[in-house]
């Protein structure tokens, strides 16, 4: 008998589900903990131009100001994340990490002097990526996804403008900017390869 190595392989759809559901569960778990009496994890968010607030770049996307804040982010995040995963799960992680780090760093540098938390910076990054990538790459798939995003979420454009004092428009603006940057870069790179 030949010695065959078996490898565990996750079907692509299952890995998309795992990726998106994993982030949703992490955010929900942290909100449950944050809701317990005497616990305030939001202090781990981004506090602009403070050395201790710099670490918030890594924590802010997973923390939320309350259940309404979390829920308002989860549905559009799940849809936009699923659309990015149509390219690949690896592509999703590249966009997620880039928008979280670059958008978060820009919030730390230029944001108002209060704590910034929430998945919406990354959500806007996914949105910016999907639109820019579709425009720049110009494949049928990329354009179709961009059209869906514009149809479903064209109203997000207003979130990059200061409207309410308790909403971090900076996270929205810099997340979208980071998404546009990575969308432009990856579209140009992918066009050279194809």
Question: Can you name each region flagged by the protein language model?
Answer:
Residues 2-194:
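A detector for small-residue-rich transmembrane helices and their helix-helix packing motifs
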């Amino acid at each position: 008998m030949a010695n065959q190595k078996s490898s565990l392989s996750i079907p692509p759809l299952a890995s998309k589900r795992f990726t998106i559901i994993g982030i949703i569960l992490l955010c929900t778990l942290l909100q449950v903990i944050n809701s317990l009496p005497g616990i305030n994890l939001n202090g781990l968010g981004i506090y602009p131009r403070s050395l201790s607030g710099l670490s918030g770049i890594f924590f802010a996307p997973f923390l939320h100001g309350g259940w309404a804040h979390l829920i308002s982010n989860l549905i559009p995040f799940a849809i936009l994340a699923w659309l990015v995963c149509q390219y690949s799960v690896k592509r999703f992680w590249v966009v997620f990490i880039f928008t979280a780090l670059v958008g978060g760093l820009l919030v730390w540098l230029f944001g108002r002097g209060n704590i910034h938390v929430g998945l919406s910076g990354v959500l806007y990054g996914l949105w910016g990526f999907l639109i820019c990538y579709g425009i720049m790459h110009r494949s049928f798939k990329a354009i179709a996804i961009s059209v869906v995003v514009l149809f479903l979420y064209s109203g997000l454009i207003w979130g990059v403008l200061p409207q309410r004092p308790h909403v971090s428009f900076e996270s929205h603006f810099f997340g979208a900017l980071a998404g546009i940057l990575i969308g432009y870069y990856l579209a140009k790179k992918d066009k050279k390869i194809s």
